[in-house]
Amino acid sequence: MYQPEFPPVPFRLGLYPVVDSVQWIERLLDAGVRTLQLRIKDRRDEEVEADVVAAIALGRRYNARLFINDYWRLAIKHQAYGVHLGQEDLQATDLSAIRAAGLRLGVSTHDDMEIDVALAERPSYIALGHVFPTQTKQMPSAPQGLEQLARHVERLADYPTVAIGGISLARAPAVIATGVGSIAVVSAITQAADWRLATAQLLEIAGVGDE
């Protein structure tokens, strides 16, 4: 059995929205979401730090699991719940500093080889993607599909896992049925005609996560 070396997270993180603003963090926390990721791109450093500080404060207020994408130094400085890194960021990041600060670590993967790389670091959870075609981010890899996702989930057994990539409200039940512990969503909420309704429906499918 694989065991994380970073601080653990619940096996089921539940619904896991990935958003790019403090405004979305606050909305979703107010709507009952308890696992989130702040992913900021193309902003000035001082703006990024201000948003990271505000998001972490909100996460604490709601007793939520807030992960900061990429900006691991700021996450350590301001004591975030956790950090999420892509494969391309692992070599350039001081993982021992993240571990020493007591932060959880999530790592993106896209195939078996990248899962091996992630497992070598023993993160808190492993993200599996992208499951379906996605417009949110340019992806060099092909979509995995449900069958491949289920195989990865089985391989990782009791390791906390997160499915990501093109997961819509309609697709969410089939993704959860693979046994994955969490579903990360972006446009399924942020581009929904009624984001509150979409969030409530996705929470009903994926839950808020284990304590």
UniProtKB/Swiss-Prot annotation:
Binding residues annotated for Mg(2+), in chain numbering: 70, 89
Enzymatic class: transferase
Annotated family: Belongs to the thiamine-phosphate synthase family.
Pathway(s) of this molecule: Cofactor biosynthesis; thiamine diphosphate biosynthesis; thiamine phosphate from 4-amino-2-methyl-5-diphosphomethylpyrimidine and 4-methyl-5-(2-phosphoethyl)-thiazole: step 1/1
UniProt EC number: 2.5.1.3
GO cellular component: cytoplasm
Cofactor(s) for this UniProt protein: Mg(2+)
Protein name: Thiamine-phosphate synthase
Organism expressing this protein natively: Escherichia coli O6:K15:H31 (strain 536 / UPEC)
Biological role: Condenses 4-methyl-5-(beta-hydroxyethyl)thiazole monophosphate (THZ-P) and 2-methyl-4-amino-5-hydroxymethyl pyrimidine pyrophosphate (HMP-PP) to form thiamine monophosphate (TMP).
GO molecular function, one term: thiamine-phosphate diphosphorylase activity
Positions that bind 4-amino-2-methyl-5-(diphosphooxymethyl)pyrimidine: 37-41, 69, 108, 137
InterPro entries linked to this entry: Aldolase_TIM, ThiamineP_synth_sf, ThiamineP_synth_TenI, TMP_synthase
Binding site for 2-[(2R,5Z)-2-carboxy-4-methylthiazol-5(2H)-ylidene]ethyl phosphate: 134-136, 166, 186-187
Cofactor binding note from Swiss-Prot or TrEMBL: Binds 1 Mg(2+) ion per subunit.
Keywords: Magnesium, Metal-binding, Thiamine biosynthesis, Transferase
Catalytic activity: 2-[(2R,5Z)-2-carboxy-4-methylthiazol-5(2H)-ylidene]ethyl phosphate + 4-amino-2-methyl-5-(diphosphooxymethyl)pyrimidine + 2 H(+) = thiamine phosphate + CO2 + diphosphate; 2-(2-carboxy-4-methylthiazol-5-yl)ethyl phosphate + 4-amino-2-methyl-5-(diphosphooxymethyl)pyrimidine + 2 H(+) = thiamine phosphate + CO2 + diphosphate; 4-methyl-5-(2-phosphooxyethyl)-thiazole + 4-amino-2-methyl-5-(diphosphooxymethyl)pyrimidine + H(+) = thiamine phosphate + diphosphate
GO terms, biological process: thiamine biosynthetic process; thiamine diphosphate biosynthetic process
Pfam families for this protein: TMP-TENI
